[in-house]
Amino acid sequence: MTKYISALGLDVGRKRVGVAGCDRTGLIATGITTVERTSFDRDVQQIQNIVNERQVQVLVVGLPYSMDGSLGFQARQVQKFTSRLAKALQLPVEYVDERLTSFQAEQMLIAENVSPSRNKGLIDRKAAALILQQWLDIRRTNAQSSVAVEY
């Protein structure tokens, strides 16, 4: 019997939060929307609506480590926002190393002949999908490894 998962991937930035969801099997992540950050309460309300609609069980948040692997100022800001958000939504959080996901998202847009400079929200959604996909892939690999060990 397959265990269903409903995770929400978030790419948290100063101005926007990219949001991604996954299919119920946990195989494919896709961008859903971009939340324009205005106030914390409004941000929570917009994300709460998505959480309710999709019956989300866990938040997967990209943590922007520095290239040397340390947590810089931006990573601490993301943790602070996420901690408050998780408490408001009463959901667990799992962090994923998001180094270079925005760059990867921009490269994907360029490959599609879409201007990254005019589509910042789309970059955030794609980055959120990359973050969530990374988490889903790790989760699936770990599940397969534990099944292999049982035999």
Swiss-Prot record:
It is found in: Cytoplasm. Transmembrane segments: none annotated. One of its GO terms (molecular function) is nuclease activity. SMART domains: YqgFc. Its EC number is 3.1.-.-. The keyword Cytoplasm applies. The keyword Nuclease applies. It holds the Pfam family RuvX. It is an enzyme of class 3 (hydrolase). Keywords: Cytoplasm, Hydrolase, Nuclease, Ribosome biogenesis. One of its GO terms (biological process) is rRNA 5'-end processing. InterPro entries: RNaseH-like_sf, YqgF, YqgF/RNaseH-like_dom, YqgF/RNaseH-like_dom_sf. One of its GO terms (cellular component) is cytosol. SUPFAM superfamilies: Ribonuclease H-like. It comes from the Bacteria. Belongs to the YqgF nuclease family. Could be a nuclease involved in processing of the 5'-end of pre-16S rRNA. NCBIfam families: RNAse_H_YqgF. This is Putative pre-16S rRNA nuclease. It comes from Nostoc sp. (strain PCC 7120 / SAG 25.82 / UTEX 2576). The lineage of its organism: Bacteria, Bacillati, Cyanobacteriota, Cyanophyceae, Nostocales.
